[in-house]
Amino acid sequence: MKKELVIIGGGPAGMSAAVAAHRSGIRDILLLERDEHLGGILQQCIHNGFGLHRFGEELTGPEYAWRYEQMVQETGMEVMLNTMVLEVTGEKKIIATNASLGIFEIEAEAIILAMGCRERAKGSLNIAGTRPAGIYSAGTAQ
């Protein structure tokens, strides 16, 4: 399979990148998400406060994710849910797997990595020092 743009991660950054790429004229886009729904961490953020700047009203995380998911669907781009990326090579080849295709390869002209993050204690990062420069937890960034 060949694609002009592959976006790995269907959370807020991945969906936003997909919509922005489509608006800039790219049409051959594939969005890969390992979970069964788009939205990433937004699905866990049940408090209000999202969407005020983008949509002009306060939304919960799942509501905000749903709005962005609708924008992605309106583009008609290909979205693969329940798809795990196993490897990304220096030649812009992606090895991925899902239940319907098994293990498969995608050749991309460009790749956007939008996989999000998980919070871990500083000791589990194996980086010396009290806090790695430029790395912030999701809680700190809020």
Protein language model regions, located:
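Beta1-alpha1 glycine-rich phosphate/pyrophosphate-binding loop at the start
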Residues: 3-67, 71
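FAD-binding core/adjacent interface of flavoenzyme oxidoreductases
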Residues: 1-8, 66-142
